[in-house]
């Protein structure tokens, strides 16, 4: 039989974790000063007047390498539990994991062939 009180801890945690950010947002809105002057609208750089432009444009190459890192990092996180229980799961899960690994490898080979990973 389904008993609702089995989920009391979950609902309590959900309510508390929802109320705390809402309260923090409301309290900061009440306590924050409303007036905005020229000093408030200026940019801040370690207590001194900023020198040069605040806008620094990064090359797209940095984002490509960061994206490849994130893809393989997330893949590692998903593969770790599979590797820990490899002897219990069987052949079908091995095939699924192989396909899961093969897709990012094919994508990275494609990006490499297109020259997206070249640092020139």
From Swiss-Prot:
Membrane topology: Multi-pass membrane protein
Subcellular localization(s) per the UniProt record: Plastid, Chloroplast thylakoid membrane
One Gene Ontology MF term: NADH dehydrogenase (ubiquinone) activity
Statement: the UniProt record of this protein carries the keyword Transport: yes
EC number: 7.1.1.-
Function: NDH shuttles electrons from NAD(P)H:plastoquinone, via FMN and iron-sulfur (Fe-S) centers, to quinones in the photosynthetic chain and possibly in a chloroplast respiratory chain. The immediate electron acceptor for the enzyme in this species is believed to be plastoquinone. Couples the redox reaction to proton translocation, and thus conserves the redox energy in a proton gradient.
PANTHER family found in the cross-reference section: NADH-UBIQUINONE OXIDOREDUCTASE CHAIN 3
Protein name listed in UniProt: NAD(P)H-quinone oxidoreductase subunit 3, chloroplastic
Organism: Piper cenocladum
